[in-house]
Design a protein with these regions (language model features):
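Membrane-embedded alpha-helical bundles that constitute the cytochrome b-like, heme-associated redox core
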Residues: 1-191
Length: 191
């Protein structure tokens, strides 16, 4: 069990949130890689390869969305005991940290929804698979103009998420190495 600080808050995040954090991090980086890879495949690529990338990209995207919702529910339930932002951070660092975390959470919810909307609105869609559940229903009307809008939102939001993830990781490394650890070293709270 994680130890409590003097004010009754946890020193480390609960193990469930730590696992969700790292699983989502791996999945998000994998999805960004697979998105780049699958959209860059040459025209003469075998259909099985296209299907492998697109089906897995879709179902792991849905999984990231579900994990983000679970993460938010757990955070909400534990909001009064989760570790606080370290006092040693400068005001701009606290603000940046809060903004980056909230944007990462927002984008891990929106990007899969944009991806789902792409598949749902695309006139030649082969569905939205989700592991053992089967195909998710496509709720939007088929409209290739809407598909183009959702595709742009999905792509540019993914680039923004990648930039935020890099900034998030850079902040953790900065506090660990440049600040020489101490009170502002937030990495141990997630390990």
């Amino acid at each position: 069990m994680a130890s409590l600080a003097a004010e009754g808050r946890l020193v480390k995040y609960p193990v469930g949130l730590r696992i969700l954090h790292w699983v989502r991090a791996v999945l998000i980086l994998g999805l960004i890689w697979s998105g780049w890879t699958m959209t860059g495949l040459p025209e003469d690529t075998p259909m099985e390869t296209f299907d492998f990338f697109y089906h897995n990209h879709k179902q792991f995207g849905v999984l990231v969305w579900l994990l983000a919702i679970v993460h938010l529910v757990i955070r909400w339930r534990l909001r009064t005991v989760l570790p606080q932002t370290p006092e040693g951070l400068r005001p701009w660092e606290k603000t940046l940290s809060h903004v980056v975390h909230r944007l990462i959470m927002l984008l891990t919810i929106l990007i899969p929804l944009f991806g789902y909307s792409m598949s749902s609105s695309f006139t030649q869609s082969d569905g939205v698979p989700f592991f053992f559940v089967g195909e998710l229903p496509e709720l939007l009307p088929k409209n290739d103009d809407a598909f183009e809008v959702f595709a742009a939102l999905h792509e540019y939001s993914a680039y923004a998420l990648l930039a935020l993830v890099i900034l998030h990781a850079a902040g953790a490394v900065k506090h660990r190495l440049a600040d020489k650890g101490g009170e502002t070293d937030v990495l141990p709270r997630m390990l």
